[in-house]
Amino acid sequence: MNHDFVEMLSALSAAGARFLIVGAHALAAHGAPRATGDLDIWVQPTRQNAGRVLAALQAFGAPLFDLTEADLCAHDTVFQIGLPPSRIDILSGISGVDFDAAWPRRIDVHIADLHVGVIGREDFIANKRAAGRPKDLLDLQLLPPPRHLPGE
C-alpha cells in the first residue's frame, strides 16, 4: 500500500477515529486485488467521530478548506485528497449499508504496523449491489467464494 495511504490510516488510528476501508482495497482484503486509483475510507458519521477525523486530516496535512464536522456527519460527503493513483476519498456514507450496523461485522487487517477495519463481506456485497455501477457489479463477479475454516 502506498506511503500516503498508510500515513492517512495511521493518522485516523492515532486520533481514535472509527473508519472502515471500502471499495477496491476492501475487495483486495476479501481476496480479489484489482487496480484502483484511490483509497476509499468510510468514516462513522457522528459528531464525536467527525472531530477525530478532522484532527487526523489536520495531522496528515490535508487541505481542509471549509470541511466541517457537520459535513462529516452528513451521509453524503465525499472529501478527496490528492489525485489518482494516490487519491484518498473520505466518505461519510455509502450506498446500502449503515455504519453502525457494519462496524461489528468488519474484518481486521494488518497494514504496515497498523490493524485497520475493512467492511465485512456481506456489507461489501450489499454496498456494491446498492451502488449498481458497472464497476461495482464487476467487483461482485471478482469476489471469491467465502472462505470457511476447518471445523466451521
Feature names for model-found ranges:
Residues 1-152:
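Compositionally biased terminal segments of proteins
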